[in-house]
Amino acid sequence: MYKRQVYCSDETIKPYIVPYENKGLQFLKRDSYLDGFQVKGLEIIERFVKDVDADIYVLTHVTQPFTKSSSIENALKKVVSGEYDSAFSAVVLQDYMWMNGKPFNYDMKNIVRTQDLTPIYMETGAFFIFRKEVFIELGQRIGNKPYIYEIDQFEAVDIDTAEDFEFAKAVATYLAK
């Protein structure tokens, strides 16, 4: 059985949850101190794991509004199967990357086609799925045997700034066509 809970300190979102209560969605109030800018994500997860008893946790971020439920369901199946201890969403980056003023993933004297570069996966905040023991034993949301679920650039849109919001509106308009 799944528990579907929105873990939030702001009770003004409750009216948005009411239409889904008949499908098992519940509001779970979290302490407002967890809203602070100095609070790290792992602190929020630690409190959530203490507040909600479950075998497997699925965390999503509202700042990634284009995440498909099918992506979450497919990644969850990998963890439920026992083949993986966790799963997370990622986009594949296969381009010329730099770090600390130097090429990171290619040799400037032997430039290969981008499609021949080794793919690099970038975590997104679309979702993290993990077994309780992963967090209890390792203190992290990704275990030692994670499944990397590749999402597309639309699902990967993350809204952190006003500019991101404007971009997301353009994506929403495009996807609505």
Regions found by a protein language model. Give the residues of each.
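Short beta-strand scaffold positions
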Residues: C8-S9, I129, I159
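Short phosphate-binding loop-to-helix
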Residues: E11-V58, T67-N74
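Active-site acidic Asp-centered loop
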Residues: T60-V62
